[in-house]
Amino acid sequence: MQILNRVLLVSFALAVTSLPAAPSRVPIILDTDIGTDIDDAFALALVINSPELELLGVTTVAGDTQARARLAAKLLWEAGGTWRKVPVYAGEPEKPQPIEQTRWANGFTSSALHRSGAVDFMKSEINRRPGRVTIIAIGELTNVAALLKSDPSMAKQIKLIALMGGSIARGYAPDSKPEAEWNIKSNPEAAQTVFSAGVPLLMAPLDVTAMLQLDAAGRHRAFTHLTPLTNALTILYHLWGNETPTLFDPMAVAMLIDPSLSETQQLAIEVDAQGFTRVVEGKPANATVGMRTDPKRFFEFYLSRVAP
């Protein structure tokens, strides 16, 4: 009997060790200018509903960064549970501009909300997990450039920068020429720092984002899902005040989770003084760049997570 028990124990141990390991979550920091356009809030909602990602924290950039941080922190609060403990750090404030969506978070407070310290937070988390942290940058690249300038060793410690920005073969309108995209042209110098730093880049330019317009059926599905998080998105959508949102920023998140959502090319990209992202022939590639996507498939992916 003892021999049989030993055989069974050994067999069980072998069976357990032969099971495939659970996929590890990707630690990320979301750097965002949430509150101006509506797509940042939709991107954060996708992060919250993606178990493949481990959100270490949110940092805010551009204009009234403290108001943006309050908005991000309240959206996380609405998600409930441990999301309420995810730290949110404001970046360096710039000249404030009116941001309608931030009215929703006026007066909101939380122990997870920090009025400054975005770059220091990034550096601390990356130092704790060298070579493992991905930054998802969906605003201008001011914070990321400041991080790289403050400590050049960061370039070798960041696993990846996934960003929404740039324009390769088309602009905002269908069949339009490439143009200076907002996140890049808002701070071309910062973008130049990031693109020349040697950090691997995953780039979601206008080529795979400008066509991602959430139609009436998609909006109805999202806004009638009636969770606290989708209810918050509904309120922010109405404060935003336009009809059809283009989900630029969620694509940067989606490409990280499921690379098959976009056809990509390995390209050498440089940023000029006007904020154009130029393809440079004959140089080693510094970016994996989204070139084509299927909007229907993207929205099936997005809504299956945020409003299943």
Model regions: which residues?
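Positively charged n-region of N-terminal signal peptides that target proteins for export
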Residues: M1-R6
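Bacterial N-terminal signal peptides
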Residues: V7-S18
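Active-site histidine-anchored catalytic micro-motif
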Residues: P23-I34, I38-K74, W83, S110-P205, ...
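Conformational coupling and interaction surfaces
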Residues: S24-R25, A43-S50, E54, W182-P308
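Short, hinge-like loop/turn segments at secondary-structure boundaries
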Residues: K74-W77, H220-A222
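A glycine-rich helix N-cap at a beta->alpha junction
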Residues: L75, A79-Y89
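Surface-exposed loop and adjacent secondary-structure segments within mature catalytic domains
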Residues: V86-L113
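Short, well-ordered secondary-structure micro-motifs
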Residues: I99-Q101, Y172-P174, L214-A216
